[in-house]
Amino acid sequence: MKKLLLSVAVLAMSTSFAMADTVRLGTEGAYPPYNFINDNGEVDGFERELGDELCKRAEMDCEWVTNDWDSIIPNLVSGNYDAIIAGMSITPERQEVVDFTQNYTPPSPSAYAALSADVDLDGGVIAAQTGTIQSAHITTTGATLLEFATPDETVAAVRNGEADAVLSDKDFLIPLVEDSNGDMVFVGEDIPLGGGIGMAFRKSDPEMRAKFDAAIQTMKDDGTLNELIIKWLGEDSPRF
């Protein structure tokens, strides 16, 4: 009987380890160049390439799961996936709910974009994605916050006149401004927010978080992380 119980215990542990070696990475799939869905219907972008390399270095099999931004932390906590890699800035408020790895991008500025340079940023209507560091910042100003579920909707709100400007990560806004043929411009000063972007894990998964944290460090040490930052975010983006 003891041998049977021991065999069952060993099998259970083996199954647990096997399950832990398949990691479900949760991302939004709607925030280029960090993450987006390509023409083949696959997750693509900076974080797809980064995540695949981190899984390789951590010796784990990974699969990608997409989830709307406004429920991305609750659905991590409830077990829909095992980690978030979705352009999520490290903030004290989020650290109360999840544990982060070290950052895989340095703190990057946020910026305002609008249809003209004479926008009232302090008293106007400013669009931002729900649950972001940008939406939290707007509430500390005199502006009226207009929140949307996706980043594309925040830009559309400016284009159709619902909002005077949008506040978002500058890396996200740069290609939109550059491709607008002058219709959209940056307004005001860049705003440093957050502590850089990291992977988020359930507080009950410290071992998994540690493996990915170590993998991020190896990419910093050998320069491959900087190479990915330049490739996807541009030469002017902060790097390590």
Where are these regions (language model features)?
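Short helix-initiation/N-cap motifs at beta->coil->alpha
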Residues: R48, W64-P74, T130-G131, L146-N160, ...
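Extended ligand-binding regions for polar small-molecule ligands
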Residues: R48-R57, S116-V125, Q129-I133, G196-E235
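Ligand-binding clefts/hinges and TM-proximal coupling segments of bilobed small-molecule sensing domains
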Residues: D61, I133-E153, F186-V187, I216-F240
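A conserved helix-loop-strand patch within extracytoplasmic ligand-binding domains
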Residues: M60, S89, R94, F100-L146
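Periplasmic-binding protein-like
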Residues: G29, P106-A111, I174, E178-Q217, ...
